[in-house]
Regions:
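NAD(P)-cofactor binding segment of oxidoreductase domains
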Residues: 1-14
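Active-site Tyr-X1-5-Lys
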Residues: 7-8, 24, 37-61
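SDR active-site strand-loop-helix element
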Residues: 13-19, 63-65
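Active-site "gating" loop of Rossmann-like NAD(P)-dependent oxidoreductase/epimerase domains
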Residues: 16-40
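NAD(P)-dependent short-chain dehydrogenase/reductase
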Residues: 51-97, 104
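Glycine-rich Rossmann NAD(P)(H)-binding loop
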Residues: 91-96, 121-129, 176
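Mid/C-terminal beta-alpha module of Rossmann-like enzyme folds, strongest
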Residues: 108, 115-160, 164, 171, ...
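C-terminal amphipathic/interface module of NAD(P)-dependent oxidoreductases
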Residues: 146, 164-198
Length: 198
């Protein structure tokens, strides 16, 4: 296990975690000090991973994020693929979160590993939206047309069972004043521009 190796060698360890460690039943953002209460197998496995890291090495950075996108299979790319292959897309309007680019998450990690500010952090872009609003913005920036319909998660083409309110408060990042995460629409626009240029 990497946490055991980190302890033996004195290395710093970064563990990427998720909003799924919370139950998502309330309507205010979760801070690093809120009790975890995962409702899915995935969430329970991520919490177990967090606990394992905490147990075996104190030189750890646990970063919880959500709705992360970049290269590979993620919500942004699935929406864009659907726009190219379908006439209609049903998207959940009852799941709320903060879309976060992998690039912004990487910036936080690169900063933290140069410090000894060990602990658990929430790291998401600023602002809140639902999946339907997220899809609307993706399609607008891509200049693509598709009949987009807001539905409940159970009817959605893209969303699986996730916490309904997956909003994280970057409380500790604000306290240590390291890096202001951008607004989610700003970050998404940057990502989409890079896709076009690439």
């Amino acid at each position: 296990n990497l946490s055991i190796v980190a302890r033996k060698t004195g290395a710093k360890m970064v563990q990427i975690s998720t909003d799924d460690v919370f139950d998502g039943i309330r309507h205010t953002p979760y801070t690093e000090f809120d009790d975890t209460n995962p409702k899915t197998v995935y969430g329970r496995s991520k919490r177990a991973g967090e606990n394992y890291v905490k147990e075996f090495t104190h030189k750890h950075f646990i970063l919880r994020s959500n709705w992360v996108y970049g290269n590979g299979n993620n919500f942004v790319n699935r929406v864009l693929h659907a726009a190219d292959t379908k006439d209609e897309l049903l998207v959940a309007s009852d799941q709320f979160g903060s879309p976060t680019s992998a690039k912004d998450l990487a910036r936080i990690i690169l900063y933290l590993i140069q410090t000894n500010e060990y602990g658990t952090y929430h790291a998401t872009c600023q602002g809140v939206c639902n999946r339907y609003e997220f899809a609307q913005e993706i399609l607008k920036l891509a200049g693509k047309q598709i009949n987009l319909r807001p539905v409940m998660t159970s009817e959605s083409d893209l969303s699986s069972a996730r916490p309904a309110y997956a909003v994280l408060d970057n409380f500790i990042l604000r306290i240590i004043n390291v890096y202001d995460m951008p607004e989610w629409k700003t970050s998404l626009r940057e990502y989409m521009n890079e896709r076009t240029e690439g």
